[in-house]
Amino acid sequence: MAVYRCVICGAIWDEEKEGKPLSELDACPVCKQPISKFEKIEDTPAKPETSAVRSDLDYDPAFARQDSGIRYMSEIHEMSVTGHSIHAAMGTQMPMPSWDDILMKGAQLDPAPLNDGDPVVTKTIIGKNAAKPMVLETPVFVSHMSFGALSKEAKTALSRGAAMAKTAMCSGEGGILPEEKAAAYKYIFEYIPNKYSVTKENLTTSDAIEIKIGQGTKPGMGGHLPGEKVTPEIAAIRGKAVGEDVQSPSKFPEINSREDLKNMVANLRKLSDGRPIGIKISAGNIEADLAYCLAAEPDFITIDGRGGATGSSPYFLREATTVPTIFALTRARKFLDEQGSDVSLIITGGLRVSSDIAKALALGVDAVAVATGALMAAGCQQYRICGSGNCPVGIATQDPELRKRLDMDAAAQRVGNYLNVLTEELKTFARITGNESVHDLSLKELMTTSRDIADFTEIPYVGKA
């Protein structure tokens, strides 16, 4: 008899206490991952247990081992046995330029700080030149995550929580979930090549429309929803068959020139009766892509940097693509200023706490979209198995039994608390730097302990006056 631990969720299987060997299980009882994900944590004289179902290509368990210190060994083993590319959930865990390497300068005498409790403006306008700008009470909102990747309960809780903070909820690329939209304070509809939920009514009852060109974890690829997540309700929204994989094209077939994109923006602006129209791009060819976007005359542009997450993306792409968010934002702000553009700039990709957001505001962003942070507030425990459909907490799943585990009322309140705390803390960052609005935060408030950040942004190094 031995004791094992699931490397995904940490569940313990003590064979003696449970009364049967690990090999008799089909999957982890908590996260539903295969028992090959268990590792032995107590040595016994007994022969190590192995999975009852093995491939002829599996490595001999008497010699196979895991060693995170050997670059890509486990990934190569998995690809070699399965014959398929690896898909992974959430964001990269590789070393990244960190928001924690940027520090704020607290005001003392020149300038002086504000007093505790002094009023600070957090109101945020997206698309100020649009006929019907979107007005939020905070510069933070919940980013695009689809119904399909997430459960109905999770999407609705996120929307209700965003409404508690008087900020926006985004649809994601899976079309509009009516319960989510009804709960929203402000709603941003994502317009994708598959045209899910594109009707005159949906365009005129959303508060902004965002054309999705790409996302940070899989730039140049369309979204993918595995068939096991395509329930009758999701199939109806997307106009697809139940149980079949859903793949979005990697690009709009009707966009082949700047003029084509401009026509799309103008058409959506007309159909939506003047709602702000945005364009979302992954951070890659930043300046060239921004020039293309500006020619289309959008009301806002969203840039998705390296460090962001998704329910499932090709592991090899996630680990090898996209400009890190700090550098992407710096380059975008510089380019837009050089062009004299006043388009609203939104950033997403790895920002979670108020200090991240305050620093992004100081670098010149108008608003920040958060995804992983909001999911954590709702209940996500980072099992990182979103694509499996077996999320133990009922968030990234369509399994009816798993969905019951998410208390929607509690999740909504937690999301609301999270967003409201972020907003209050942003006010504090404004006060300690002597600013009456969070949108007055600027580069003069920043310094960095990273020479790379100092060399490739305008943030000064802490060792220099």
Regions found by a protein language model. Name each.
Residues 33-34, 41-140, 144, 149-160, ...:
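Conserved, well-structured core domains of diverse proteins
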Residues 352-465:
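Gly/Ser/Thr/Ala-enriched C-terminal appendages of enzymes
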Residues 3, 25, 388:
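Residues immediately within or flanking Cys/His clusters that coordinate Zn2+
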Residues 17-26:
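Short linker/helix segments within small regulatory modules
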Residues 15-16, 37-38:
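Short, non-ligating residues that shape and space the ligands of small metal-coordination modules
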